[in-house]
Amino acid sequence: MQLFAPAKINLSFKILRRREDGFHEIETLMAPISLRDELTIEPNESGFVFSVDDPSLSAGEDNLVVRAARSFFGDVQEEPRVRITLRKKIPHGAGLGGGSSDAASTLLGLNQLYGGRLSSSRLTNVAAGIGSDVPFFLVQSAAWCRGRGEIVEPAAVPSMPILLLKPQFGVSTSWAYQQWRDSRELPGVDFAAQSAGELSLQNDLERPVFEKHIFLAQMKGWLRDQPEVAAALMSGSGSTVFAVLRDSNSADAIAARAREELDPMLWACAAQL
């Protein structure tokens, strides 16, 4: 069985408050994009085997694919007898939800392989126990996510061309949340909501992340200055900044200019909402 795990971007991200359980109450509009990882799941009578083609990622118990598989088999009370192979395209520490998407696709694939043993509501509960973003990826469409992210309401989002830019460094999501309360807006950086068609783009996590990583603020500002760009925003906790393009044919030219003017080592990817 072959499955595809899409990346996501946050089109809107608001932090409402810090909760007593340590999580943050959020409201975010997330949308899957055409960039995606690939998973293969097949029966394996000798037990559970997991491999990933990215040597920088753990293939151990802390990998979200492994956690998802363990959670699924624990819930259905079966011995895990599958081989899962993960081929990565989504960069790590990028704010694109790659690990959460891989976990959700693992749950969906295993549930299909085992005859739909878990109901959709039970699958959602299992997903929420793995990570806050995992329930969103079960929906396989754009959605408003509330609570700590586990309350998911599908939404309609128009298709748009986008360009993703990411520097070599990543950003820790937990660190970004921890810094949010005491962070301040940097002078000269525009944090105001931007319009892109019917959408209003804004991200509350830009404030703490830009304080530490001023380059991301500069990259966002640079993108907004490009005539082919309608809006630009950091996705999630970063370090990816995405641009909504007026024309999909401009992606390569913008990426080339960004590498020339900002950082020759930038990772760039043209994608579609």
Predicted regions and their residues:
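ATP-binding N-lobe of GHMP and related small-molecule kinases
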Residues: 1-94, 111-121, 148, 166
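Glycine/serine-rich anion-binding loops at beta->alpha junctions
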Residues: 85-114, 132, 231-245
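Short strand-connecting beta-turns/loops that link adjacent beta-strands
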Residues: 44-46, 157, 228, 237
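ATP-dependent small-molecule kinase catalytic core of the GHMP/sugar-kinase superfamily
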Residues: 2-4, 12-28, 116-231, 244-273
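Short, well-ordered alpha-helices that flank and scaffold nucleotide-derived cofactor binding pockets
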Residues: 70, 74, 108, 112, ...
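Short, basic/glycine-rich phosphate-binding loops at helix/coil junctions
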Residues: 45-58, 106, 128, 194-202
